[in-house]
């Protein structure tokens, strides 16, 4: 264990590894029926998940060995690219899936990706750059440029991807807090956030309906509540021990995105309260070790990066599991490490490589 500690924090590494293993088994189970129905191959999604997992592991390895100064140098270009790609969602390149245009299609291919994933993590590095650059400065010198970046990052994706916008906002505000936010700045940001919420959510009827539908999950089962109602049914069916691996009933066209957005519900159905508790415990361990990793950093930049990464992944997991359990409105966010892989898994693995690097024992960053 001491030998491993030289390369990464063992509990953090174990939490990530176990979540990935759970993901492999659960994608195999939750996607089998859909793969067989759509493509005549029950292992279609499983095989693709393994490919993306391998790519993600390579990305994690690369990010683990690349010095943080390299990411610091390319933070602004990456953030700018993310902004441009998110803006491209409003063009013909944007792909509408389940009523939301969150995906971009690469011309000449069948490859789709969510540009918000690029912006989500690029924002962490660029905001960290600004917070370090303007350390000790306030208002016009430091406060306004930083808030502008946070605001632009959130607003550009909020129209089509409100849930990702919330993850970005929480992770960046967490970084701002760590850097020494005072009460006046907190009140200012809170006021601006409420104003944005008012114009983008409270004044848009269909968003308000989506935001509040979880309070009455069985009122409109044929429309907005279909996913949530079936998710709750799956969780309830699983009871304490679950009905068994590969025995889910909800994957038979009852629970849309069973291998993706609602894979936590399938875990609850097949492995019950015990299974979901294990997953929640592993994510709690991830957040706790991520927090400790951030605390032990000697440099402000490293502390901010670790904070942004563990908050982003941790809150995305919280939102996903909260939706499946019926305590949060439907978001469309995947469950990190576990949901069917794609570019989202690759990005999460890349960020995990950086977090593991920062967690190394005795390294001066």
Regions found by a protein language model. Give the residues of each.
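Loop-to-helix entry and N-terminal half of a specific, functionally important transmembrane alpha helix
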Residues: 294-332, 338
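Interfacial segments of multi-pass membrane proteins
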Residues: 131, 171-185, 249-275, 333-346
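Membrane-helix boundary/helix-loop-helix interface segments in multi-pass membrane proteins
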Residues: 1-14, 18-19, 25-159, 321-336, ...
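Alpha-helical transmembrane segments of polytopic integral membrane proteins
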Residues: 24, 124, 128, 204, ...
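Hydrophobic alpha-helical segments of polytopic membrane proteins
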Residues: 76-83, 139-156, 162-202
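Hydrophobic, glycine- and aromatic-enriched re-entrant/interface helices and adjoining loop segments
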Residues: 97-103, 112, 187-278, 298-305
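Membrane-interface helix-loop-helix junctions at transmembrane boundaries of multi-pass membrane enzymes
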Residues: 133-143, 185, 291-311
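Hydrophobic alpha-helical transmembrane segments
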Residues: 51-56, 120, 270-288
């Amino acid at each position: 264990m001491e030998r491993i500690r030289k390369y990464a924090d063992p509990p953090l590494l174990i939490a990530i590894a176990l979540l990935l293993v759970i993901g492999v088994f659960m994608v195999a189970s939750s996607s089998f029926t859909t793969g067989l129905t759509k493509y005549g191959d029950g292992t279609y999604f499983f095989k693709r998940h393994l490919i993306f997992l391998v790519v993600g592991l390579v990305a994690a390895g690369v990010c683990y060995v690349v010095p943080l100064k390299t990411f610091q140098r390319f933070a602004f270009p990456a953030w700018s690219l993310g902004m441009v790609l998110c803006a491209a969602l409003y063009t013909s390149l944007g792909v509408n899936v389940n009523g939301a245009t969150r995906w971009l299609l690469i011309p000449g291919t069948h490859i789709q990706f969510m540009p918000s994933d690029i912006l989500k993590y690029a924002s962490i590095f660029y905001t960290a750059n600004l917070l370090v650059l303007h350390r000790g400065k306030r208002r016009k010198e430091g406060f306004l440029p930083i808030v502008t970046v946070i605001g632009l990052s959130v607003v550009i994706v909020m129209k089509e991807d409100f849930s990702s916008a919330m993850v970005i906002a929480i992770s960046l505000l967490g970084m701002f807090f760590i850097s020494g936010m005072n009460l006046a700045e907190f009140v200012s940001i809170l006021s601006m956030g409420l104003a944005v919420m008012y114009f983008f959510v409270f004044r848009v009827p269909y968003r308000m309906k989506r935001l509040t539908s979880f309070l009455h999950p069985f009122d409109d089962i044929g429309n907005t509540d279909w996913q949530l109602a079936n998710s709750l049914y799956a969780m309830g069916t699983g009871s304490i021990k679950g009905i068994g691996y590969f025995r889910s009933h909800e994957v038979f066209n009852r629970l849309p995105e069973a291998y993706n957005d609602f894979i936590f519900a399938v875990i609850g159905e097949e492995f019950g309260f015990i299974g979901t508790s294990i997953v929640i415990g592993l994510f709690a361990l991830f957040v706790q070790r991520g927090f400790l990793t951030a605390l032990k950093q000697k440099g402000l930049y490293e502390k901010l990066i670790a904070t942004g990464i563990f908050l982003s992944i941790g809150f995305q997991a919280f939102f996903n599991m909260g939706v499946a359990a019926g305590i949060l409105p439907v978001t469309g966010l995947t469950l990190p490490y576990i949901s069917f892989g794609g570019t989202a898994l690759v990005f999460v693995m890349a960020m995990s490589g950086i977090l593991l690097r920062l967690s190394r024992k005795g390294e001066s960053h």
